[in-house]
Amino acid sequence: MSILSALTSISNPMKSTKSSVANGGGRLSMGTNSVACGSCGGGNSSSGTINNADGSQTTYYSYTSPVYTYNYSYSYSSSGSSSCGCH
């Protein structure tokens, strides 16, 4: 009788300056500090903004079905797995 153990190795997140996300069997690479996500349904367009200290605004994401584009760096594990937060 044996006991099978699954060991999960978790390493420190690494900062990404060029984002890529899994896209089916391949990988979808975008420009620096952006990430493309698959469709979350609907045909809407939206965007999110940050209010800067000087009163200006910075758009940090935009959505036009079926692609989200995020305008910031994000961290991911060394395994390269990441998700786009479509719920």
UniProtKB/Swiss-Prot annotation:
Signal peptide: none annotated. Pfam families: Coiled. One of its GO terms (biological process) is sorocarp development. Residues 1-23 are annotated as: Disordered. InterPro entries: HssA/B-like_chaperone, HssA/B-related. Belongs to the hssA/B family. Residues 1-22 have a biased composition (Polar residues). PANTHER family: HSSA/B-LIKE PROTEIN 1-RELATED-RELATED (PTHR31059), HSSA_B-LIKE PROTEIN 1-RELATED (PTHR31059:SF5). It comes from the Eukaryota. This is HssA/B-like protein 7.
